Amino acid sequence: MMFEHVLFLSAYLFSIGIYGLITSRSMVRALMCLELILNSVNINLVTFSDLFDSRQLKGDIFSIFVIAIAAAEAAIGLAIVSSIYRNRKSIRINQSNLLNK
C-alpha cells in the first residue's frame, strides 16, 4: 500500500517538474523544475531499491550520487544565469539567445 503512494507522489512531482519546465519563462524557475524532476527520480530509486532488495543499498548510494550531481548542476546553472543577467539584464529564456548578439 505504501509503495503505490510513494510512486504516485514521485509521478506527481515529475509531472509538475515537466509542466514547469515546459511553461517557464524564467531560467531560475526552469532550474528549479529540473531539480524537482531529479528529486522525483531519486524518490523512485530509493523506493525500488527498498522494494526489491532492502539489504543492499545500491539505490540509496546511486541516489546520493544523483543528489551530488544535481547540486553541482544547480551551482553551475545559477552561475550561468547570473552571468547572463549581468550581461543582458534579463533572465527570461526567450530574451537570452546568445548566438545573435
Swiss-Prot record:
GO biological process: ATP synthesis coupled electron transport; photosynthesis, light reaction
Pfam families xref list: Oxidored_q2
UniProt keyword NAD, yes or no: yes
InterPro entries: NADH_UbQ_OxRdtase_chain4L/K, NUOK/Mnh_C1-like
Keyword tRNA processing: no
Transmembrane segments: 2-22, 32-52, 61-81
Gene3D superfamilies: 1.10.287.3510
Keyword set, alphabetical order: Chloroplast, Membrane, NAD, NADP, Plastid, Plastoquinone, Quinone, Thylakoid, Translocase, Transmembrane, Transmembrane helix, Transport
Group of enzyme by EC: translocase
Major subcellular location class: plastid
Subunit-structure text: NDH is composed of at least 16 different subunits, 5 of which are encoded in the nucleus.
Function of the molecule: NDH shuttles electrons from NAD(P)H:plastoquinone, via FMN and iron-sulfur (Fe-S) centers, to quinones in the photosynthetic chain and possibly in a chloroplast respiratory chain. The immediate electron acceptor for the enzyme in this species is believed to be plastoquinone. Couples the redox reaction to proton translocation, and thus conserves the redox energy in a proton gradient.
Family: Belongs to the complex I subunit 4L family.
Protein name (Swiss-Prot/TrEMBL): NAD(P)H-quinone oxidoreductase subunit 4L, chloroplastic
Native organism: Lemna minor
Upper lineage: Eukaryota, Viridiplantae, Streptophyta, Embryophyta, Tracheophyta
